[in-house]
Each structure stands twice: as structure tokens, then as C-alpha cells.
Amino acid sequence: MEETFTEITPQQAWEMMQNEDAVLVDIRDMVRFSHSRPQGAFHLTNHSYGKFLDEYDYDEPVIVSCYHGVSSRNTAQYLVEQGFERVYSVKGGFEGWVRSELPIELGY
């Protein structure tokens, strides 16, 4: 059976960040990430992937968020294939995060 990721709600993602030291990676473009993002998010891009590998271990929970919860699935699956053991994708992405009224950071 192929290992895969798990889809979770924005609220579940926030709880994992608080209780399990999960890292939330935001894969949206730089302009949107710079404007507003989930509180504590790491901006994961092709350029920041090396830094991400330096800062986080393969056994740490990783939560992937995008715009609407679609492209995060591909990134989540990629991270599983790279050896990350606990990978999650946020249903509804950043849009769902905002609708759930979870903490965000604004500005640069």
C-alpha cells in the first residue's frame, strides 16, 4: 500500500501546530504570502526547500496549505515521497483558514 498524506480541516491544522509542534508550510506565491498568511507559516518554494530540509526533521508533522486546498495535495504527496512521515493537507487552503477565523499574519 502506497503511503500518502491526510487531509485535515484548518481548525485541526491549527490545533496540531499548537499541540504537536507541527509546521505549516504555505505554498502560495510570494505576493500573496507576503500580504497575509497563517500565523507561523513557513513559505515553501523551490528556492526555500533546502532551508526547510535544514530546519525540519522527517518525523515532524508537516501541514501543507495553498490557496483553496487543491495544489497542496500534490505538494503533500511529494513530501511523503521524499520521506516525510506525517504529512497533511489543509482542506480549503488559506481561504478556509480565513473562513475559520484562525490567526493570520499581515504584511511583510
UniProtKB/Swiss-Prot annotation:
Q: What is its EC number?
A: 2.8.1.1
Keyword Repeat appears in the UniProt entry? no
Domain named Rhodanese: residues = 18-106
Kindly list the cysteine pairs connected by disulfide bridges.
Answer: none
Q: Which GO terms describe its cellular component?
A: cytoplasm
- What enzyme class is recorded for this protein? transferase
What keywords appear on the UniProt entry?
Cytoplasm, Transferase
Q: Name one GO biological process term.
A: glycerol metabolic process
Question: GO molecular function: any one?
Answer: thiosulfate-cyanide sulfurtransferase activity
Q: Which reaction does it catalyse?
A: thiosulfate + hydrogen cyanide = thiocyanate + sulfite + 2 H(+); thiosulfate + [thioredoxin]-dithiol = [thioredoxin]-disulfide + hydrogen sulfide + sulfite + 2 H(+)
Question: Signal sequence: where?
Answer: none
The entry's active site is C66
Q: Where does the UniProt annotation locate this protein? A: Cytoplasm
Return any one Pfam family short name: Rhodanese
NCBIfam families referenced in this protein's UniProt entry, alphabetically:
PRK00162.1
Q: Could you say which protein family the record assigns here?
A: Belongs to the GlpE family.
As for what it does, the entry says: Transferase that catalyzes the transfer of sulfur from thiosulfate to thiophilic acceptors such as cyanide or dithiols. May function in a CysM-independent thiosulfate assimilation pathway by catalyzing the conversion of thiosulfate to sulfite, which can then be used for L-cysteine biosynthesis.
Query: Mind telling me what this protein is named?
Result: Thiosulfate sulfurtransferase GlpE
Task: Record the organism.
Answer: Glaesserella parasuis serovar 5 (strain SH0165) (Haemophilus parasuis)
